[in-house]
Amino acid sequence: MAYKRVIQGKVVKKSGDKTVSLLVERKVVHPKYHKIVKRFKKYLVHDEHNKAKVGDIVTAVECRPISKRKSFRLKEIVQAGVE
């Protein structure tokens, strides 16, 4: 069985039926200035039962491509956010 990436981030948008937009933050060291900087990336995540709401912290796991940009599915809601 292949290794599946697990990402954790904040739901920033309900992108449509069964889809949420997830903002994932990572910290990297700048190559020249050696300062820790934040980098952000948005992922589209498949939410089969429309459980996630804007502001929630969720975990998503990689799966087969569901659409052109959507290849993660919702695993669990870690923390419910305040709308």
UniProtKB/Swiss-Prot annotation:
This is Small ribosomal subunit protein uS17. GO terms for biological process: translation. InterPro entries: NA-bd_OB-fold (IPR012340), Ribosomal_uS17 (IPR000266), Ribosomal_uS17_bact/chlr (IPR019984), Ribosomal_uS17_CS (IPR019979). It comes from Nitratiruptor sp. (strain SB155-2). The lineage of its organism: Bacteria, Pseudomonadati, Campylobacterota, Epsilonproteobacteria, Nautiliales. The gene is rpsQ. The keyword Ribonucleoprotein applies. CDD domains: Ribosomal_uS17 (cd00364). One of the primary rRNA binding proteins, it binds specifically to the 5'-end of 16S ribosomal RNA. Part of the 30S ribosomal subunit. One of its GO terms (cellular component) is cytosolic small ribosomal subunit.
